[in-house]
């Protein structure tokens, strides 16, 4: 057994996870590689034989080659059933409820970490590691494990990890959090990872590699297209201005693909699944200053006592804005931003930061409705 300990590394077959595994081995850890097969087209509503990215045979073979060439064991685990139940079902249900889901957060919280920790225990591994650009450390004063942004702000993935509880963070290692992406590609070349060093980054949803989520929903839900077609576009005053293809195929803030000639640019400002109605309007009608989030997870503190200044983000790659956050009950966060935010979208993640640390997060449930006075105080609070 290595003095550093035994670590189970999630390996997708990409450059980040491959460098993570080899870097930890170079640092003296006893490394075990694990590739998780989470989906295929036959079980997730698509066409057989079209797997690409992290669940393709090529990617699994790339991970195996890295492990073999660097002398550590590698395993593959089939998580398609769990992924389908937790991620794909909720993804589908959220769109059918008029919300816009974030499947990566669900996968990290309920699939990847649960599966990694279970297999880590089976393989006598003390730690798990991934190629996420984030950092974790133990804070003696708070007696808590803290999650913080990665050094490379362009690649920072702390937003997608807000749902990890303390017991998961306690066993997690993120070696790439201290590096920028160009350094990782340089390391890949230095380590001789020729099969992955120049692989392009992946930005699409892993189980929708063509990024066509309306097509995915139509493939997955029998009769959906016929059921929801013929809905109406309306203005905020109720004036009907056109027909649409069905409410699940649109998202808050969308402008392209509306096929409306109204003499000005309009955006989706509201989605009503009950009436199959989509409200459109000018950009100004997308601006909101308050929100409510549920299913929360607090990282830096066990609970929030009163209003706390924070930096709030409402989607991946959102620059964020100063805000006040408070916790009216165990499972709810309310947030008032110092200035109105564009297209706050139910179903997306709210993530709060305090300096570089993740304060906590939750799923955006309701937009507006929080106290106007709180928004005024947020404008005066330190960012």
Curated annotation (Swiss-Prot):
Its EC number is 2.8.1.13. It catalyses: S-sulfanyl-L-cysteinyl-[protein] + uridine(34) in tRNA + AH2 + ATP = 2-thiouridine(34) in tRNA + L-cysteinyl-[protein] + A + AMP + diphosphate + H(+). The keyword Zinc does not apply. Keywords: ATP-binding, Cytoplasm, Disulfide bond, Nucleotide-binding, RNA-binding, Transferase, tRNA processing, tRNA-binding. It is an enzyme of class 2 (transferase). SUPFAM superfamilies: Adenine nucleotide alpha hydrolases-like. One of its GO terms (cellular component) is cytoplasm. This is tRNA-specific 2-thiouridylase MnmA. It comes from Salinibacter ruber (strain DSM 13855 / M31). The lineage of its organism: Bacteria, Pseudomonadati, Rhodothermota, Rhodothermia, Rhodothermales. The gene is mnmA.
